[in-house]
Amino acid sequence: MMEDGVIRTARIKLKSKTRQKKKIAAAVYEYQADCDGEWGEIYFDFEKGRQKILWLADWDTTKSRIYAKRVIDFVLKQDSEELPKERLIAFEK
């Protein structure tokens, strides 16, 4: 259970990306909750506007998926042609 007001972090790494007609059509990001434990993966289909959590990182709960949701929000706000290779995302619960 997370306490309110505590700063949390999600580390992300671009695992792969697929191009179609010189544009990034899809990407897979690995993410790690609070820089600890096993990595999870999230698939982004930019052409169809869909995302899918392939598997949750350690410390990300099945019910809230707070870390995965923050990663999805962050990636969707980026220019799909300039996706970050690695980033540390900090957020407050």
Task: Identify the role of each PLM range.
Residues V6, E38-E41, R50:
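Intrinsically disordered, low-complexity regions
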Residues M1-S16:
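Short, basic/low-complexity N-terminal boundary segments at the transition from targeting/disordered tails
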Residues Y43-D45, G49-K93:
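Acidic, low-complexity intrinsically disordered segments
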Residues M2, Q32-D34, D79-E81:
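Homeobox/homeodomain signature
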Residues I12, A27-Y29, R70, E92:
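Short stretches within intrinsically disordered, low-complexity N-terminal or propeptide regions
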Residues K13, A26, W55-W59:
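Generic preference for well-ordered secondary structure
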Residues L14-F44:
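Amphipathic, interaction-prone secondary-structure segments
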